[in-house]
Amino acid sequence: MARERTVEIREHEVPDPAGGPYGITAGPDGALWFTLVHSGLIARLAPGGEATTHRLDADSGPAIITAGADGALWFTEHRAHRIGRLTTEDGLTEFAPPTPQAGPYGLATGADGALWFTEASAGRIGRITAEGEIAEFGLPVPGAFPSMIAAGPDDAMWFTANQANAIGRMSFDGTAVLHELPTEAAAPVGLALGPDGALWFTEIGAGQIGRVTADGAISEFPLPDRTSRPHAIVARGDELWFTEWGANRVGRIDLDGRIDVHELPTPNSEPHGIAVGQDGALWVALENGALARVAPESHD
């Protein structure tokens, strides 16, 4: 029987709403951590509590944030060209990649325990250890603009190559392979490992969700609104959820490619990052100054 797909959506205020909530992740402490890209803040929202903030340089442009294997929160400073590490015990530490003006953006923990990041402006992939040692690896195509990155099922890192119109795979020795997308100018951005062992991604330029297996086989699923500009994606249970930055919606896709989308309460809220919280709900960073809690209510 077809499932009735409904959700409950509530918005939560954040400190400095003009700061622009952008990236979001569930921390090892059970709290939600998110970036405020326009004001240079890292914020923490504990369950049932109020948000607290940690200040960076105002123009640092914190973008993507994730939990490291060392229990710290790591994030990219896209405009300051740094990688940041934050703990309640040690405070803030920042590291600059060897390549100047690299534009670090995507960030994910690898199976090797290191943090891997994209250098969007430099067209490279970087690796940083918990001690701050950084290595950089080139890509086979110049100007690829690598965006999001995720650990794959195969002891490798996978990434979206936005301007190369491809999905990339990088082994831990720095060898990169690109898989070209069937749709021209698809401009992939978001990326997540799915429950089926494949990588799922958003095509912001084509209005589609894509899927790539470890051997490079690609499928694409058109969204109901091809102009919706899907941005970030995350796995939850046996489905994946994504943000539609250009259409003020969140959506989900199941492993058979069935899609449903849901309007956000505030018009033009600019949904970007999305994460699964400790409470099992989806939490979305809205660049217009709030977080949205999306609680699926599925009935068979």
Swiss-Prot record:
Quaternary structure and interacting proteins, as annotated: Monomer.
Domain of life, source organism: Bacteria
Recorded family membership: Belongs to the Vgb family.
Protein name per Swiss-Prot or TrEMBL: Virginiamycin B lyase
Designated gene of the protein: vgb
Catalytic machinery residues: 272 (proton acceptor)
Enzyme class: lyase
GO MF terms held by the record: carbon-oxygen lyase activity; magnesium ion binding
Gene Ontology CC: outer membrane-bounded periplasmic space
Species in which this protein is naturally found: Saccharopolyspora erythraea (strain ATCC 11635 / DSM 40517 / JCM 4748 / NBRC 13426 / NCIMB 8594 / NRRL 2338)
Enzyme Commission number(s) of this protein: 4.2.99.-
Residues where substrate binds: 231
